[in-house]
Amino acid sequence: MSAAGPSMMEIEAEEAVLVAERQLLDLPPLLERLGQNVRDLDPQFVITCARGSSDHAATYAKHLIEIEAGIPTASHSPSISSIFGTRWRRLETTLFLAISQSGQSPDLIVSAQAARKAGAFVLSILNAASSPLEEESSAVLPIVAGIERSVAATKSYIGSLLAIAHLVAEWTDSDPLKAALQSSPAALRSACELDWAEGVEALLRVRDMYVIGRGSTLAVAQETALKMKETCGIHAEAISAAEILHGPIAIVGAGFPVLVFVPSDAAGPSVASLAADLAEGGARVIVAGSGVRGAINLPWVPGLHPAVAPAASILGVYKMVAALSVARGLDPDRPRLLHKVTETL
């Protein structure tokens, strides 16, 4: 927070609580129908299609769908359709999941057209009330985040995660996941109270860093790295806790900053162990989601379902990043060279 008050980025991040409440209030009838649509389709394969923050939500969707539904899920590169004009064959039993805030980017629209023409069921998760992407979709799940004024997406990203979780819960008829989502507003309220000032201090003069996650927290790492770049001018690279061991760990020397998100699931112990090893080796390690010896341990919301925990974690990130941006003399609401709606071919 600056002397002039909280940034729009921070205000809108905290509005994610209202988004979670709105989804629980407004979406159940639609979610029930969409869940039945997907069960009737009985997809053999899921393809995600998105850009930017929405593509990080797609990373989350891949993990959750493969864990909860047992369906292989892969990311589609929009340029395959928009630039190279690939014609898909036999997508009749495929769920094509497009995720977008605005639904305006031409490459996503062309990709949805191509997938639907090949027989896929195109389900778009959108924040915009109406858009060209909606017109090319078989069905739409609204994020209901409302207008977002800050260039950096916050509540719409959190809303995307929760909308995906709601969809998967209905599709798989998962009582544990449905119950966890009922508590999502409370989880986000708790996240609003997290104090990550130690993280701001530790990253104040950083130029390069790694952001590490695995499984349910890889999407959190990806989104965090993007926000570090666009609002703080930090060259942050998101990487899996497994992938970093296949070479990239070589640049982690004494004092190298690493932010680690430890998941609250089966992957947690391996990620916490890596964080401990990096700290022991002299890296400046910041951890959210666990207590790691030798690291700066940020507070987190304990006891959350692994599908809900990422939404709470990224809310804490947004508040920290907004404060870090201001502390570095920048404006988190107006990143250089960026616009709210980005259209790519």
Positions of PLM-derived features:
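Generic C-terminus detector
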Residues: 304-345
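Active-site phosphate/pyrophosphate-binding segments
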Residues: 4-44, 139-257, 267, 328-345
